[in-house]
Regions:
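Secretory/extracellular carbohydrate-interaction modules
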Residues: 1-41, 54, 145-150, 162-174
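Secondary-structure transition/turn motif
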Residues: 30, 81-84, 141-143
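Activation corresponds to long, low-complexity, non-globular regions
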Residues: 106, 111-174
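Short, surface-exposed beta-strand/loop "edge" segments at domain boundaries and coil↔beta transitions
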Residues: 33-40, 85-86, 109-119
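Carbohydrate-binding surfaces in secreted/extracellular proteins
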Residues: 59-87
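Short, aromatic/His-centered strand-loop micro-motif at the edge of beta-sheets
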Residues: 42-66
Length: 174
């Protein structure tokens, strides 16, 4: 997500976290000024700088997870996954709310592929985002980034959301 008048943030689930290791829930904001969380909070660098909070979260394939991001006032943003606090990050209090455009994505978080078989098969289903107790998007656009020539990755619309597939044997037919 982007914050009006500020920078970008992301919130999601990962298979291989660092501090803590293993499956995690993570919330990060570029340009964040402070962070507080039950397991890990601190600065990040590498692709810009900011603050991050993370918790161990044993998500399971096929289980629905509810991610909630809420403004708490005085520049603080709170992230929860399935009712559990991931943490809070403080940004410049002049930044506004969530910008009108948001992005949901899947990412292979690993070294570059040496062969297509290394991609593996993964599926993520995203429900339609809802803001401020019921505000829903007017529309959406699917985009698939270029892949290294490996077949089987696609994005498709579902009733109330989208499905991201990576490394499938073949894309669905018409």
């Amino acid at each position: 997500v982007a914050l009006v008048g500020g920078e970008a943030a992301y919130f999601g689930l990962q298979t291989q976290g660092s501090a803590p290791t293993g499956k995690i829930a993570i919330f990060s904001v570029w340009g964040g000024q402070d962070a507080d969380g039950p397991e890990y909070s601190g600065p990040f660098g590498g692709e810009g700088t900011g603050m991050t909070v993370r918790i161990r979260h044993r998500w399971e394939p096929g289980r629905r997870e509810r991610l909630v991001l809420a403004a708490e006032g005085d520049g603080w943003w709170r992230a929860e996954v399935s009712g559990r606090l991931v943490g809070r990050i403080r940004v410049d209090a002049t930044w506004g709310g969530i910008a009108p455009q948001t992005v949901m994505w899947t990412e292979r978080y690993a070294p570059p592929l040496r062969r297509c078989a290394d991609l593996g098969h993964a599926v993520a289903i995203f429900g339609e985002p809802v803001a401020d107790g019921g505000v829903r998007p007017l529309g959406h656009r699917n985009h698939l980034a270029p892949n290294p020539g490996c077949p089987g990755s696609f994005v498709e619309d579902l009733d109330g959301g989208v499905r991201h597939v990576m490394g499938a044997p073949a894309a669905p037919g018409p």
